[in-house]
A protein has these predicted regions:
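Structural signature of FAD isoalloxazine-binding scaffolds in flavoprotein oxidoreductases
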Residues: 99-107
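Conserved phosphate/anionic-ligand binding catalytic regions in large, soluble enzymes, centered on
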Residues: 77-98, 191-195
């Protein structure tokens, strides 16, 4: 673990100091908006279906485009919220956390929708939240299974929702706090700070997308065509 991430992990419990007025509830709000859509941003299923149609029904290519689009969104969102230099740094963290959560939830939801999972199913939603955690952290947590196993479970444990919400909120805040430390020097030149933040957000989003792509197999009835 990097120095920045270790410091971020230490700071994460102090949510009110890092991101005032932010609570774990923002995770569910981000997930809801990601699935239903917000403003001019269509919901996850509609956006994913469009990518699938543009690739002539090829699920592999459609999934690839969903990931690539959201990696770009994450980079742009990170750039926008990390510009401004040291003076505005304390005020941009909540926007960065909530915006990135929405982008990543939308990407994961789009992929699992293409694989045949119902986005209104609480099991699917719990699996989506699980995917926002670092892959190594998922392996260390005491969970009833992998994200795909959670989405496919015969019985849903409602207490899992609270556990996952808190874990995801902590993880997102840890990343943001660690990134703040890592980019402080860069922020003395605001554009440099923006580029560093954009790159970090895009890379984490790409890692999550690749993990989801590997983790979720198409459900029965979904035709799977690999790219040639």
């Amino acid at each position: 673990m990097s120095v920045a991430k270790r410091v971020g992990a230490a700071l994460a419990p102090h949510v009110t100091q890092i991101a005032p007025n932010l609570s774990a509830a923002f995770v569910h709000q981000a997930l809801d908006k990601a699935i239903t859509g917000v403003g001019r941003l269509p919901g996850a299923a509609a956006a994913a279906d469009k990518q699938l149609a543009e690739n002539d029904g090829d699920l592999d290519r459609g999934t690839h485009d969903v990931i690539e689009n959201h990696v770009r969104y994450a980079g742009l969102q990170g750039f926008a919220t990390n510009i401004g230099g040291l003076v505005t740094m304390a005020f941009t963290v909540p926007t960065n956390i909530t915006g990135l959560a929405l982008i990543q939830c939308r990407m994961v939801a789009g992929i699992v929708h293409l694989r045949g999972y119902d986005l209104d199913d609480p099991r699917t939603r719990a699996a989506i939240l699980t995917c926002l955690l670092d892959e190594d952290r998922i392996k260390k947590l005491v969970l009833p299974g992998t994200p795909m196993e959670i989405a496919s479970a015969q019985v849903f444990d409602s207490t899992l929702n609270t556990t996952l919400t808190n874990e995801v909120a902590s993880e997102l805040i840890t990343r943001a706090a660690g990134k703040r430390l890592a980019t402080t020097i860069g922020r003395r030149t605001p554009v440099v700070g923006g580029v560093v933040g954009a790159s970090a957000d895009a890379f984490v989003t790409w890692k999550i997308g690749r993990y989801v792509d590997r983790e979720f197999l198409p459900r029965a009835g979904r035709q799977w065509r690999k790219r040639r």
